[in-house]
Amino acid sequence: MDWVPAHFPKDEHGLAYFDGTPLFECKERRMAEHPEWGTLIFDYASDQVQSFLISSACKFFEEYHIDGIRVDAVSSMLYLNYGRRDGEWTPNREGGYVNLDAVAFLQKLNRTILVNYPGAITIAEESTAFPLITAPPENGGLGFCFKWDMGFMHDTLDYMQLDPYFRSFNHDRLTFSMMYAFSENYILAYSHDEVVHCKNSMINKMSGDYDQKFASLRTLYGYQFAHPGKKLTFMGGEFGQFIEWNWQQPLDWLLLGYPKHEALRQYCRELNRLYRGEDVFYRCDNSWDGFRWLNVNDRDRSTIAFLRTYPGAEGGVVCVCNFTPVRNDDFVIGLPHAGTLHEILNSDDERFGGAGVHNEGTIRSHHAGFLDMEHSARITVPPLSCVYFRYKVRKNHK
């Protein structure tokens, strides 16, 4: 559930100057108002305000049995100078810009929820590089279970809106997320925030004609599911709704009567099924031990390949994504050990609305080095596609 302790409206029937004094908001007038949103900011130093907010969250867990909360606009809580110019904010007691009272409040909030509601999750929507969002409070962290990976979302969506010709010049947008992927426990979220306010729906963000939009979205979802981190896709994106989300009307379920939309839904269903069945996707999700690049720098063909695995696994799943409308034959990927590849998912499958370009049978590795690996394999990658292969290491070749 989206839960917002960062600010509240000035409406006279609400909490603003509740008893004629700044009861819920900051006592210092210039720090009480959010300069960008025109709302009021809670006084996190107040025990009464802390009790009110934490009780609010607990109420939803106890009475409505929610699974977790997503705390909105955490960045605006953490920085005293958020949205403010020099001279418009007051430093903390240590002379810095971090809102120490908000930090203490978030730590208390997470401790309270995770102790009293075992199995609950707390998620921070935080868009900066503030450290230790998902670290335990006793280690100096805020104590959240997960943090939304805003960087992955922005980079991949910006990339997918580019004409494929220009993607080679922006290859880093695909790969940069792995520079920080294990610094927090991330959720890769394509949320409601990205399909409102004239930002376009997920399918309409994709570059190209009608067929290419569907192929591109299948490729993007395939990359999202194989990338380290948990997954979140807002409703409607799984079957390619063309209009933006409107809270005042239902989704366009009638689109499932059209082959391309139903095929996309089937593809998303298969991604979920495969994700549940292949533990390499989540067993080692927060360490380089679970991920290895197999081909990362082929910017000319805008194609990447990587391995998901875990320590002790006899192989894993290889993911290859082609972000151009050009078929790549004899595409080379490195392999850490001799073994075989067998295609287990192909977004270009005719079942999912594709053209049906496959890798038939078993592909065997060659003792030909590639990048820093001693072995390699040659595969076919369809245009605008994501292909998963089951990789089995040949015995006695580890």
Language model feature labels by segment:
Residues 259-281:
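Catalytic cores of secreted or luminal carbohydrate-active enzymes
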Residues 46-49, 53, 94-102, 209, ...:
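Residue-level preference for long, well-ordered alpha-helices that form the structural scaffold
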Residues 360-398:
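C-terminal beta-strand-rich structural cap/linker in extracellular carbohydrate-active enzymes
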Residues 65-67, 85-250, 276-348, 355-356:
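Conserved alpha/beta catalytic core and glycan-binding cleft of carbohydrate-active enzymes
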Residues 2, 53, 60, 71, ...:
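Conserved, mostly hydrophobic/aromatic
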Residues 256, 351-367:
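Extended carbohydrate-recognition surfaces in non-catalytic/accessory domains of CAZymes
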Residues 1-97, 363, 379:
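Substrate-binding/active-site clefts of carbohydrate-active enzymes
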Residues 49-60, 105, 109, 220, ...:
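Alpha-helical packing segments of well-folded alpha/beta enzyme cores
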